Each structure stands twice: as C-alpha cells, then as structure tokens.
Amino acid sequence: MPAYGLTYRFRFPVALRRRRRSRFSGGSLYARRRRRRVRVKGGFLPALIPLGAALISAIPGIASVAMQASQLKK
C-alpha cells in the first residue's frame, strides 16, 4: 500500500496574546500570592447544594445495600 495517502496532523501551542511584565517580577512572593487568590462568590449555601443533591441521589443505593446485608444475616 503506498504511503502517500497518509496524513499527519500536528498541534502546536501558539501564544495569541502576550502579557505585559508586571512591576512585581522580582522575588516578591507576597504580590504573586495575593494576585492568585480568587474570592468564591455565593457563600456557603451554594456550595452545599451539589452535596445535597448527591446525597439524595445516593440514598436508594445505600438503602438497598443495607437491606441486602440484613437479609444475608438471617
């Protein structure tokens, strides 16, 4: 079979936008840490909503395992 029908595709990362160097490009770790910190919006309650949904969806599975374990002991 001839090899001319084979196509290779390569992906190369390309920098589309260059960042300007900041004033704190030296050894100032405090400025870097402060800049990376992102405040979580919404507070504590929106973080609990996915956990509550996961618990509600897991209840039938937990109950079935408990029922099977109790039936095996009899």
UniProtKB/Swiss-Prot annotation:
Positions bearing the site annotation: Cleavage: G27, S28, G43, F44
Domain of life: Viruses
UniProt keyword terms in alphabetical order: DNA-binding, Late protein, Virion
Subcellular location: Virion
A Pfam family assignment: Adeno_PX
GO cellular component: viral nucleocapsid
Keyword Transcription regulation in record: no
Positions of the propeptide removed during maturation: 1-27, 44-74
InterPro entries: Adenovirus_late_L2_mu_core
GO molecular function, one term: DNA binding
Similarity annotation: Belongs to the adenoviridae pX family.
Known role: The role of the precursor might be to condense the viral prochromatin for encapsidation by virtue of the two basic domains.
Record-given protein name: Late L2 mu core protein
Organism listed in the record: Murine adenovirus A serotype 1
Gene this chain is encoded by: PX
